[in-house]
């Protein structure tokens, strides 16, 4: 097949899509122009919109001996659609556009984000994912039984690997670097946020595993701005995330945060190397049961 998405459209539970050497880019790649706000929200390169099943994962991986590159300048590299489960992604290089951005461009984008958020005009909105695109992630929808392994993810403006509202996630043997430089969204390199148990399965077993990853040089260089903090943010500083906020408090190497208060699953961190990250190497925040 010519595109990875075509291969995904043909696969069934238990099947594998092999990807050979090459550079795979999103539509309109290379035609972004922040000075005119052109193509600032390009689509993902790869969308996994199917589920496997227990014992029959869908696998998206490199053909043996190959290292295909996913190159994006928009929303992200590989996204797993909401409520798609039993997925394995392995053996890719995923590269974002961070090397094409500088501090002045990112600060100007933060100013624009503030302008459209506070202009009291409902017809304007901020959607510049160019400055916050993720490498491999699950959108902001629920997932369970996902494996992300043996990938190289770098120069993503937002998180390199991220899952929200999920359970049974394994992130192992990835190399992650140069992420989060240019976003004003206070993101981190590898993130498990708002983890929640699969219905009927809220045990204290080890369910969320981050191991064997090399995570380095992931920083926030741009101050955080958001119109409203999440109710479960846990931050009581009235200036945090406002237009006038002058500090940078975020940018972790590995970050677990804001898990569901009733979530009983155990998080395992094992044999990760975290070096030269912005705030912390590993930060376990507003969650329970880590080992």
List where the protein language model places each region.
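Extracellular beta-strand-rich solenoid/capping regions of secreted or surface-exposed proteins
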Residues: 2-5, 9-13, 26-59, 68-91, ...
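Short glycine-centered segments of the SAM/dcSAM-binding site in methyltransferase folds
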Residues: 16
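Right-handed parallel beta-helix
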Residues: 20, 57, 61-66, 85-96, ...
